[in-house]
Amino acid sequence: MSNKVKYNLKNVHAAKLTESVVDGVTSFSYDTPKAIPGAVSISLDAEGDSSPFYADGIVYFRTSSNNGYSGDLEMALIPEWFRTEILREKLDAKGVLVEKSDVTETEKFALLFEFDGDVKAIRHVLYNCSASRPSIESKTKEDTIEPGTETLSLTADPRSDGLVKSRTGDTTDKATYDGWYQTVYIPDETEG
């Protein structure tokens, strides 16, 4: 049975990406996904252009490019492990997170998450993400406590082999679905 609706972002995870080139052959590996608790919202816009070619007075041919996605992930707090492993902040000997200006590039990572569905959750993975440093903001407490959030600006580019994103479907096998957060799912190159 298929989902009719989706709602409720949850189970956000990230897995550091390592890209290696040996003898001209590029390979990709991922660390074990780690949870990022406290997901509030995600909004990712598709990146790419559609270019028409006109002939005979009509759009004769149209090309589309897939340049991945960009947008925001809002969460309660960015975990310390994500700040050190992905954003490359340093934890000093006294346990203080230190951000330095010489970090010009954050680590690439896979972003895994899911939306509830009326039948079954829909699980996603974006394979080549980068995140920019979050803004710092808060406000004073008034009559009631209103928790603040932190937002990561994300870019999910295609990997050099073209892989952008995967998601579970109506017929995803049980082992793949159940193991979604144990390892980063990589599609079989001989399929599809």
Spans of features found by a protein language model:
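Short secondary-structure transition/capping segments
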Residues: K16-L17, A121, T155, S160
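Solvent-exposed edge beta-strands and adjacent loop segments
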Residues: S2-R83, A131-T149
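Mixed-charge, glycine-accented linear interaction segment located at domain edges/termini
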Residues: C129-G192
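Structured, beta-strand-rich domain cores
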Residues: F61-Y127
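Context-gated lysine
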Residues: K4-K6, K10, K16, K34, ...
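Short amphipathic beta-strand/extended segments with alternating polar/hydrophobic composition
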Residues: S29-K34, R123-C129, S166-D170
